[in-house]
Curated annotation (Swiss-Prot):
This is Thiamine-phosphate synthase. 2-[(2R,5Z)-2-carboxy-4-methylthiazol-5(2H)-ylidene]ethyl phosphate binds at residues 134-136, 166, 186-187. 4-amino-2-methyl-5-(diphosphooxymethyl)pyrimidine binds at residues 37-41, 69, 108, 137. Binds 1 Mg(2+) ion per subunit. Its cofactor is Mg(2+). It comes from Salmonella paratyphi A (strain AKU_12601). Its EC number is 2.5.1.3. Keywords: Magnesium, Metal-binding, Thiamine biosynthesis, Transferase. Pfam families: TMP-TENI. The gene is thiE.
Length: 211
């Protein structure tokens, strides 16, 4: 049963771009996206704080669900909608502080064991990946494919889920057909020949999520 220790999110978060700059946040919110993540890697908090502040302000302006990847202290300090953490971050993060601050929590998973770990944290949503081969980041695990994704979705039937990893415009309908609540995309938008057109098509397929 879906009873997270953190504030709930809609079962369907819709199209969920993951981007590395405030510029992309602004572009995509203007284009109609309503769930989005700022993922800046390998910088100190003081180096990214201005970007986090700007992204959160944009999220509020567009009434969007803006998640901050990794920088949970900054997300708490500036009252973001939510935080997204990888498995490697769970042990070093003060989850109770995030919960007390009223932020939503998303957690990445790559296999059954990591799903068990995520469920123990009782997050707002669980991300399942990587579905297809991806060039966006180095992955120690193998792509799961659609059959494995279906199995995980069946296990997490009443939990908000997000599929991520190598999801292209062409793959999107088949991924959503598994019953997953949302699709997270990176290069399908940021490396598209026409990002506006790609975003519009993906929004038509995945929607903006439930209210």
């Amino acid at each position: 049963m879906y009873q997270p220790d953190f504030p709930t999110v809609p079962f369907r978060l819709g199209l969920y771009p993951v981007v590395d700059s405030v510029e992309w946040i602004e572009r995509l919110l203007e284009a109609g996206v309503r769930t989005i993540q700022l993922r800046i890697k390998d910088k100190r908090d003081e180096e990214v704080e201005a970007d986090v502040i700007a992204a959160i302000a944009l999220g509020r302006r567009y009434d969007a669900r803006l998640f901050i990847n990794d920088y949970w202290r900054l997300a708490m300090k500036h009252n973001a909608y939510g935080v997204h953490l990888g498995q490697e971050d769970l042990e070093t993060t003060d989850l109770k502080a995030i919960q007390a601050a009223g932020l939503r929590l998303g957690v990445s998973t790559h296999d059954d064991m990591e799903i068990d770990i995520a469920l123990a944290a009782k997050p707002s949503y669980i991300a399942l990946g990587h579905v297809f081969p991806t060039q966006t980041k180095q992955m120690p695990s193998a792509p799961q494919g659609l059959a494995q994704l279906v199995r995980h979705i069946e296990r997490l039937a009443d939990y908000p889920t997000v599929a991520i990893g190598g999801i292209s415009l062409e793959h999107a309908p088949a991924v959503l057909a598994t019953g997953v609540g949302s699709i997270a995309v990176v290069s399908a938008i940021t490396q598209a020949a026409d990002w506006r057109d790609a975003t519009a098509q993906l929004l038509a397929i995945a929607g903006v999520g439930d209210e």
